[in-house]
């Protein structure tokens, strides 16, 4: 009886070791950086573009007109001598890129953020896109929330990554887990050899 019990324990251990383990998501390699696609219960993310300089993924939202997107772009940065200079540069650049004729800007917040001991900048932009509803001519506000992480490469501070996660939605369809989902995506960022 003891040998059957021992055999049963060995068999359980072997079967447990052979059980399928969750796979790590595929790393997307970019020039000096890598990221992972989101792991989700539903495989709704679409890889729209992938080059060594740009990766774009997106998925439809739960409601009509709602979408989520993540764009990682390798960028050139000016010579910046401090984390505060990076924050100031990012805020200035983002404000210039937001067209006031197209967007009503509610918030632009930029703060320093450490990623793998590298000084980065983290921003949150909340804006309303001014557009006319189909057929009515009445203006409709479509909200655009964007969380962006900008990091210089540790080996070449003039080379950076701009990783932006955005949610486009009607005002009543805000996603309460937006910031958490963005953080999950941004935590996949790694610096790679140049």
Regions found by a protein language model. Name each.
Residues 1-8:
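Bacterial N-terminal signal peptides that target proteins for export
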Residues 16-17:
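C-terminal motif of bacterial Sec signal peptides marking the signal peptidase cleavage site
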């Amino acid at each position: 009886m003891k040998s059957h019990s021992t055999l049963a324990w060995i068999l359980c251990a072997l079967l447990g070791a052979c059980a399928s383990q969750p796979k790590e998501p595929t790393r997307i390699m970019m020039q000096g950086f890598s990221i992972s696609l989101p792991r989700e219960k539903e495989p709704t993310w679409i890889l729209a573009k992938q080059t060594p300089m740009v990766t774009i993924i997106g998925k439809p939202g739960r409601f009509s007109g709602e979408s989520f997107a993540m764009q990682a772009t390798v960028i050139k940065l000016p010579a910046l001598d401090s984390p505060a200079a990076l924050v100031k540069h990012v805020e200035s650049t983002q404000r210039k890129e937001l067209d006031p004729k197209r967007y009503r800007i509610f918030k632009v917040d930029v703060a320093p953020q450490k990623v793998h001991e590298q000084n980065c900048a983290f921003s949150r932009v909340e804006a309303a896109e001014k557009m006319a509803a189909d057929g009515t001519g009445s203006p409709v506000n479509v909200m655009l929330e964007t969380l962006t992480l900008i990091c210089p490469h540790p080996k070449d501070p003039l080379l950076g990554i701009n990783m932006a996660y955005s949610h486009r939605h009607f005002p009543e369809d805000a996603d309460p887990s937006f910031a958490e989902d963005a953080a999950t995506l941004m935590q996949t960022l790694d610096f790679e050899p140049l």
